[in-house]
C-alpha cells in the first residue's frame, strides 16, 4: 500500500472487517500518495491529452488499491457553452462498496478553482462542491449510519438532517382527509397514488443549485443519452419504444440519484422513479403560476429528456406481443411528460439551453402513429397496446375481484392504469392538436374504459384517483413564498374547470382525473359509439357529479378523494 494518511484510512476501513477488500500490491505500489488537502488534478492544463484531443470528457483514474476514481470533467456545457462549476466524480470498485463506511474528503483544483471533494462508498458517487459544504465528515458518517440518503446537488441551502424541519418519518399511509396537505404527509402507499409532491420533494427540486440543474440538463441531452439529432432507421426521431440496450441506460440512471426525474428524498424508504412513482408532474403547475418561469420549464423539459433516456420497452415487436401493465403506464406517463414539455416550450420564446419545440412535436407524432397502428392489430384485445400480461397486481386493489366476477381476464388493469391512459389522451387532445389523440381517446373509451369502470362495481368512484391539484396548489403557494417568487402567485384564485367537453382550451391549473375520465367517455358517445357500457358509465358519473346539487368537477373530485 502507498504511504500517507489515505492509505492508513483505507487500512483502517479494511482491518476490522478482515479481508473484506482484496488488495492488489502492484496497483497499490503504483498509486501516488494522496493526502488530505492535496490537489488531485488540475483540469485547465493546456498540455493535457484530453484538452489537445478536444474531448468534452476526461477520465482520470486515481488508483488506490483495488478501486479508482473516475472524473467526468466537461469544461463547458455543449448545451449553452457555459463552464461547469460542479464536477461529477464517479467512484468505481470491483467489490462490495458497503465495506467502506467512513467518508473521506480531499481538495481538488478543477477549472482553476478549489473544491472540497466528498464521497461515500455506499453511494458510488463523489461530488466536487462548488461551495463550502456545511457539514463535517463526522456528520456525513452519521447520515450513512442512520441510513439517510445524501442529497447530492441540493444547493446552497443544504443543512444537516437535524436542522431540516421537514425531515419527519414517511408513514406507509396517511389519510388525505386528516388535516389536508402537510409537509409530512408522505404518500398513501397505494398503487393509485398520483401526488401530491410533498414539501420535502419540492424543497429538493427548488433548492438544487443552478450549476447542478445545468449538469442534470446536460446529462439529459448529451451525456450517455439520446441526443435530439439521432434518428432511427426510418429517418424519424427515436421513439419511446426503441430499445437502447447498448447504452444500458437503465443501469446508468439507477446509480445516480441526482439524475432521477424526481430524486429520492432524505428519509424516504423508496425511490421515486418511472416504475413506481406514477410520475407526478411537479413543474407544470408552478410554471403556469410563475408565468413560465425558465426554472420550472427547464425541470419539465429535463423530465421529458430523462423519459427518452430511460423508457425502453419494446411496445410493438414483429411478433405483435402484448404490452404489460407497467409498460402501459410508462407509455402514458412518458407521453405526458413529452406533451407538457411541448406545451410549455410552445408558449415561450426559444431558449438557447433548451431543445426546440419541434423535437418534442416530432417524437409525439411518431409515437401517436405507432399507437394508432396498434388499434388495427387483430387479437390484441382492448386497444391492443394497453393490456396486462400478469394475472396479479403488486398491491391489493378493490378492482381485482370485481374484475374476476364480471368475467374479465384476471388482473386486467387492476391498478389505475386505465385512468392514467385516459388522462394522457385527454390532455394530448387539448394540448397537441394532432387528430390522432381524439381517435385514440374515442377508441380507448369505447373498447375498454367504460367496461373497466363498470367492472369495479361499487368501487367505481372510490377507486378513481381523484387527487386534486388543489392539494398541490396549497403546497406551491407555500413554496412560492419560501423561494421568493412574486407574491401575487400565492394569491391567484383557484380556477374552476367544469368546462364543456369539447372546449379546446387547456385546464390551466389541474390534472384532475375524473374530469378526463368522463371526457373520454363523453367524446365516444358523441362520436356515435353504440355501446351500452359507455352510456351506463356516463349516466353513473353524471349522477354522481350532480348528487345533491350541480357540483363542479373539483367538488366531485374532492368528495371522492377521501
Model-derived regions: residue spans:
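Solvent-exposed N-terminal domain segments of exported/luminal and surface proteins
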Residues: 2-35
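Catalytic cores of extracellular degradative/oxidative enzymes
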Residues: 22-28, 35-41, 45-562
Amino acid at each position: 500500500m502507498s504511504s500517507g494518511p489515505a492509505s492508513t484510512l483505507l487500512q483502517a476501513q479494511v482491518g476490522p472487517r478482515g479481508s473484506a477488500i482484496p488488495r492488489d500490491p502492484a496497483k497499490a505500489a503504483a498509486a501516488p500518495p494522496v493526502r488530505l488537502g492535496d490537489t488531485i488534478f488540475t483540469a485547465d492544463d493546456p498540455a493535457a491529452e484530453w484538452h489537445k484531443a478536444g474531448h468534452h470528457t476526461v477520465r482520470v483514474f486515481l488508483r488506490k488499491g483495488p478501486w479508482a476514481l473516475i472524473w467526468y470533467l466537461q469544461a463547458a456545457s455543449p448545451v449553452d457553452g457555459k463552464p461547469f462549476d460542479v464536477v461529477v466524480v464517479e467512484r468505481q470498485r470491483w467489490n462490495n462498496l458497503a465495506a467502506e463506511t467512513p467518508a473521506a474528503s480531499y481538495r481538488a483544483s478543477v477549472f482553476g478553482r478549489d473544491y472540497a471533494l466528498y464521497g461515500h462508498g455506499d453511494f458510488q458517487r463523489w461530488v466536487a462542491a462548488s461551495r463550502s459544504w456545511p457539514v463535517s465528515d463526522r456528520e456525513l458518517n452519521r447520515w450513512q449510519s442512520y441510513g439517510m440518503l445524501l442529497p447530492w446537488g441540493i444547493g446552497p441551502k443544504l443543512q444537516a438532517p437535524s436542522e431540516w424541519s421537514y425531515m419527519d418519518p414517511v408513514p406507509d399511509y396517511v389519510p388525505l382527509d386528516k388535516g389536508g396537505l402537510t409537509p409530512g404527509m408522505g404518500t398513501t402507499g397505494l398503487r393509485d397514488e398520483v401526488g401530491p409532491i410533498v414539501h420535502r420533494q419540492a424543497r429538493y427540486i427548488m433548492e438544487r443549485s443552478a450549476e447542478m440543474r445545468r449538469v442534470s440538463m446536460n446529462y439529459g441531452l448529451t451525456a450517455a443519452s439520446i441526443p435530439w439529432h439521432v434518428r432511427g432507421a426510418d429517418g424519424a426521431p427515436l421513439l419511446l419504444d426503441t430499445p437502447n440496450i447498448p447504452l444500458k441506460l437503465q443501469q446508468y440512471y439507477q446509480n445516480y440519484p441526482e439524475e432521477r426525474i424526481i430524486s429520492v428524498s432524505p428519509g424516504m424508504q423508496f425511490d421515486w422513479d418511472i416504475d413506481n412513482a406514477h410520475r407526478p408532474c411537479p413543474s407544470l403547475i408552478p410554471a403556469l403560476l410563475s408565468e413560465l418561469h425558465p426554472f420550472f420549464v427547464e425541470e419539465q423539459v429535463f423530465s421529458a429528456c430523462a423519459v427518452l433516456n430511460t423508457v425502453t420497452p419494446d411496445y410493438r415487436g414483429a411478433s405483435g406481443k402484448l404490452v404489460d401493465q407497467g409498460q402501459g403506464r410508462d407509455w402514458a406517463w412518458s407521453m405526458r411528460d413529452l406533451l407538457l414539455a411541448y406545451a410549455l416550450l410552445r408558449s415561450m420564446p426559444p431558449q438557447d439551453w433548451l431543445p426546440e419545440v419541434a423535437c418534442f412535436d416530432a417524437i409525439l407524432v411518431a409515437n401517436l402513429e405507432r399507437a394508432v397502428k396498434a388499434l388495427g392489430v387483430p387479437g390484441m384485445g382492448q386497444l391492443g397496446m394497453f393490456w396486462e400480461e400478469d394475472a396479479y397486481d403488486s398491491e391489493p386493489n378493490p378492482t381485482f375481484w370485481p374484475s374476476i366476477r364480471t368475467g374479465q381476464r384476471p388482473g386486467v388493469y387492476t391498478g389505475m392504469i386505465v385512468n392514467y391512459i385516459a388522462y394522457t389522451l385527454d390532455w394530448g387532445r387539448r394540448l397537441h392538436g394532432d387528430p390522432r389523440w381524439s381517435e385514440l381517446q374515442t377508441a380507448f373509451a369505447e373498447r375498454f374504459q367504460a367496461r373497466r369502470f363498470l367492472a369495479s362495481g361499487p368501487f367505481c368512484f372510490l377507486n378513481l384517483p381523484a387527487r386534486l391539484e388543489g392539494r398541490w396548489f396549497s403546497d406551491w403557494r407555500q413554496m412560492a413564498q419560501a423561494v421568493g417568487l412574486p407574491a401575487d402567485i400565492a394569491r391567484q384564485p383557484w380556477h374552476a374547470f367544469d368546462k364543456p367537453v369539447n372546449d379546446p382550451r387547456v385546464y390551466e391549473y389541474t390534472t384532475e382525473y375524473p374530469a378526463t375520465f368522463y371526457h373520454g367517455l363523453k367524446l365516444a358517445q358523441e362520436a356515435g359509439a353504440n355501446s351500452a357500457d359507455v352510456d351506463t358509465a356516463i349516466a353513473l358519473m353524471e349522477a354522481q357529479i350532480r348528487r345533491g346539487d350541480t357540483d363542479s368537477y373539483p367538488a366531485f373530485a374532492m368528495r371522492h378523494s377521501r
